[in-house]
């Protein structure tokens, strides 16, 4: 049995993305108090707010520091966050590394790393005072082994998050805070729908387990586990969810 602590206050970024919405739906069913941040669309999570009293959706551009800070102040003035899940979704563009300009790297770093850092600075003091907390970021299996071509801005931003996760796990462990990441291989989401069919078929054929892409629920199930008491002695881990396509 998955041992869930009593109702937790959980903050989720990218909550309307393919993975984020799957996480949100699963944790809503666990009756957790959810604060779901989204930027553009809320079509996948609107029904959650209408179905569950414990779900609140909030429009916020997390790469905009001022907007993010205002949202966080409002949330933490009345709620102590127990779990922070970082799952920002951003359309992936393929580009030769030398054709990228620094602004594109900066854009990815702002979305993935800067927002993660800024949110952590808000929620970690609360977690420290409770001597308990969970921080989970969604990365990519591309941070392990050889990266693919043409995705340098995305891969570099995810590597930066991996480094931040390890540093935070190391420094916050004494306060009872677990910091981990999950690295899925290619996931069947709106973000990957635009990829050429042939590319996806080649990729699937190389996955040992069931020759299929990862599903959002495959990732959400691991998030649910990390949120539970069963994972209270796991920190500093990057958990691969890749059907065996990446091993280390």
Predicted regions and their residues:
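Conserved mid-core segment of classical short-chain dehydrogenase/reductases
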Residues: 89-106, 149-153, 193-197
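Conserved glycine-rich cofactor-binding loop
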Residues: 16-17
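Catalytic Tyr-X3-Lys loop
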Residues: 98-117, 132, 136, 161
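A conserved structural motif in NAD(P)-dependent oxidoreductases
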Residues: 208-219, 230
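Short C-terminal tail/terminal secondary-structure segment
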Residues: 224, 235-248
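Alpha-helical segment proximal to the catalytic Tyr-Lys
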Residues: 125, 170-171, 232
């Amino acid at each position: 049995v998955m041992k869930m602590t009593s109702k937790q206050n959980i903050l989720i970024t990218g909550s309307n993305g393919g993975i984020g919405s799957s996480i949100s739906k699963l944790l809503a069913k666990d009756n957790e108090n959810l604060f779901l941040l989204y930027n553009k669309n809320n079509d996948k999570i609107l029904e959650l707010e209408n179905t569950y009293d414990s779900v609140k959706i909030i429009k916020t551009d997390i790469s905009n520091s001022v907007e993010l800070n205002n949202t966080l102040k409002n949330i933490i003035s009345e709620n102590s966050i127990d779990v922070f899940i970082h799952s920002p979704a951003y359309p992936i563009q393929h580009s030769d590394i030398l054709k990228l300009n620094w602004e594109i790297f900066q854009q990815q770093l702002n979305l993935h790393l800067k927002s993660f850092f800024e949110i952590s600075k808000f929620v970690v003091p609360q977690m420290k005072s409770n001597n308990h907390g969970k921080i989970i970021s969604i990365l990519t299996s591309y941070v392990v082994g050889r990266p693919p071509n043409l995705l340098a801005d995305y891969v570099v931003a995810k590597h930066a998050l991996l480094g931040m996760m390890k540093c935070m796990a190391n420094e916050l462990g004494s306060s009872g805070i677990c910091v981990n990441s999950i690295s899925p291989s290619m996931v069947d989401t709106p973000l990957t729908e635009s990829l050429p069919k042939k590319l996806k078929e080649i990729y699937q054929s190389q996955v040992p387990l069931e020759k299929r892409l990862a599903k959002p629920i495959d990732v959400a199930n691991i998030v649910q586990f990390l949120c539970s008491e069963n994972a209270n002695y796991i920190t500093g881990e990057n958990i691969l969810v890749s059907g065996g396509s990446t091993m280390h």
